[in-house]
């Protein structure tokens, strides 16, 4: 807490400060250049609104000026998370680590979609619950809905009448009739009551703060039909409305802090739940421009906040943002240098009265104010009469001061008073708890009585969710105690007050607490000793529940938490520092990555983008976290500045991280210099996973420089080698030879399974590192490809049986779990078994059925054959984008095409990327999703981009596809492109979800000819022609950029950089070689050595050449050789007399029998094969 400087001195300081700003023109221009264009742009677009509030409502946006504005424009950036599937009413509170996993997931929506069809239920909800933390903006949102409807901008066609009720005011009424209730909900009567009630399906009732009053809204007379003029208790009337006894067709919008509404509304139907997540990054900045009338003050204030990541994160909560702005404004008015060093909401609240309330009122009148707040909280009251104020000892002068400073507000409609915000009332109530002693007026309330009152008010389950309790923890921390002693000029007994915290913790211990609520309390307290003790206790008391996604044997090692907001992420990562049991932290998990589940870990789920401030806080905390050894950020799209901040942490001497997963993080060669600096800095890092990133040759060379440094401790590096040049791969192999401890691996394996007794589809996972240890750390060769099945013993080769039918065979050697990365298929088998897999086309089966009208294809179609009973589970891939870990199986079906017709089977489980069938029966089968036709274009899907190139004499031709992530489609495109000698270039897929039927614009660097420039994302069967854009590059002497943007919003959804080195060999040599084409070797002669060594099935090749190139005598002479290598040598010996046309026939036959070998040789040679 800063001392208030003398006024004269402070004015001098302000003058000096402003003078320095004027003199320092460079800094001043930087400020203006950074903020003025954004401000001017927002002003022109009307995106910096001044929201008008009635005097009786909470004024979080001071109205400096009033003007008409488009309210809907303000809703578009407000983060609203709609839950896909309603929660179990008995488990509506996030109670433990395990129950905090994303059971139902959700998706971001706009305010216009609140009463639209729910993706989970396909029905329009009659009841929408807006939930969220204290001060998150629920009430403001509800009022803006009413105002936007009134101005014709929202729901005007849906509702004829919208009624708004503040439940805190409604609770003051004892009895009301339905007519009186409707009259209260209207500013001005709009129609006779009979006319209003004649169309109940056109009525919307908004009940703000439904959980605030101390009532139970039970439908006590469900069979009794009351007249609209008959008066009854308010809680009974509302209970009848919500219970559908009265106006069953009406619509309702409720706002509430808690999701556990069943105890307040026993007859509550299953609602659509929408969570308000607070201000986005840009909204926090915009708020400062709304609050401060002076533009320069707004810029100065926001710059100060922006420089403090913790303070910026706290501003995610709108009421805290208001608190920060109010404190900064007071400092400006008092001539102080702007300074807010608060790290918690409690510290900010303590700052508020010290700046706004004069010294003369602090000691006595603030205590009376705290008593008023506490009485209101215990009795669920937020409105107070003048007699209530007098009863607590508040004199007129003090009340006038509190009104002037904004601590209290006077309600013009009811001549009553309230605190500026309910959270502020709860803060003062918390102070009252601490200041209480046995002689004060609250019934000789002692320590136990305080705790019992808190439990009675909030309940044991919700105790740590209550702002009053969180403020108590903050006030009883060391900094909180100092702040109160300074505010009240008194001395508090630290030991006695600490005992109160243990009483609160003890009362909740028999019941499973909300883990996130408890973490919030611990964060507010900031006491290291308390944090260490409580977090250590959590290790033994919190165990996973039935929804834990961890595998059954090891699930007690996994703690899982949903962190929807930046604030929750900051709180969780701060507290994890003191959780000694956790060894690995995983953020925003998409899939299980390739590491051991046996290592205790914490999984933080997040569906909304993470701001730079949150990344900075996370990495700062990691510097001092001694227990964490692993960090998994896979699936997060990381900006360069974020990786820069991460690498600064990894280079910090105290950082203990040993394993880092950055799979599919959008990394490019530019990032590799940062990672190389970590490898060269004597860091503790020993394992690094970088698959599914576009690092390129240049990036990997930078990594090699770091690996060569003698202080580098890295022992395992995972990369995608398929896109690297032979020269870079050789460089990596040389590094391995020089450093026996270093293992560089390709092929990303999501799991490596080890069979155990009683193993089911959730087999125990073990890491590559563990397997290496079990094998005695012997050097391992890179074996297998993405087409192989990876199992307990490593890769199992997949055999091509019939190329025309796309029929494959795999012989699984033992019991275990096997996964094929390229197809997404996953089998759990009980014994050795041979499985045949045929790629099928949906059009062969679906076109003649009505299924395509009611269901949408969401995955590939396979015809699988296996011995009955050998396969205990099959995982079938799908491309619906599910952000949660476990989705409902209600709408997903597995379609079986059998002789007698179609069978739709409900999968046992649905997870991101696949469905699970236990003890399956096999036939042509694949995933479908039950839909209504109108929703087909609103299902988020995972997509891929495919780029192919062919080198011509004067130019390069590219083919660019945007298709759903379906291996059968990719295989069909690969085959078609290979016919015309096009070679695929591997680039990362789009990060965002896309939608079937959406259109996208393809663009790129200058001098590119693109036809067509517009692509539609659609699902076409693998037998159908796939849409693509053809791109001509006249002279690719330098890199080119390709982009795909959403046509509607022109938002960038995908970007790739193509360099001349991607088209190997280098283009100048290719261009010159093509001019001398007659002198170039044919493919057959160019790759003689590799073909002799790698062609494994010579007889099928000979059969295709028999009669065309080989006569009977030559055919038998080659077959007479003993080994495949000898047969190929004999064939090449005969080929000396062949013409180019004969060699072309050999090349075509080789493509049909050994397509992957031809593709591999083409890629390594740059795709040039003349005569083919």
Swiss-Prot record:
Residue ranges of the region described as Disordered: 1-22
Name assigned to this protein: NACHT, LRR and PYD domains-containing protein 1b allele 3
Organism: Mus musculus (Mouse)
Compartments where found: Cytoplasm, Cytosol
Activity regulation, short description: In contrast to allele 1, does not undergo autocatalytic cleavage within the FIIND domain and its mode of activation remains unclear. In contrast to alleles 1 and 2, allele 3 is not activated by Val-boroPro (Talabostat, PT-100). Not activated by cleavage by B.anthracis lethal toxin (LT) endopeptidase. Not activated by metabolic inhibitors, such as 2-deoxy-D-glucose and sodium azide.
Effect of residue 927 to V: Restores autocatalytic cleavage, as observed in allele 1, but not response to anthrax lethal toxin (LT), nor to metabolic inhibitors. Restores autocatalytic cleavage and IL1B release in response to LT
Highest taxon listed in the record's lineage: Eukaryota
Reported function: May act as the sensor component of the Nlrp1b inflammasome, which mediates inflammasome activation in response to various pathogen-associated signals, leading to subsequent pyroptosis. Inflammasomes are supramolecular complexes that assemble in the cytosol in response to pathogens and other damage-associated signals and play critical roles in innate immunity and inflammation.
Gene3D superfamilies: Death Domain, Fas, P-loop containing nucleotide triphosphate hydrolases, Ribonuclease Inhibitor
A Gene Ontology BP annotation from the UniProt entry: pattern recognition receptor signaling pathway
Site entry: Cleavage: 922-923
GO cellular component, one term: NLRP1 inflammasome complex
UniProt repeat feature LRR, residue ranges: 627-647, 684-704
Post-translational changes noted in the entry: In contrast to allele 1 and 2, not able to mediate autocatalytic cleavage.
Every NACHT domain range: 126-435
Disulfide bonds: none
Tissue specificity as recorded in UniProt: Expressed in macrophages.
Pfam families assigned to the protein according to its UniProt record, in alphabetical order: CARD (PF00619), FIIND (PF13553), NACHT (PF05729), NLRC4_HD2 (PF17776), NOD2_WH (PF17779), UPA-FIIND (PF23679)
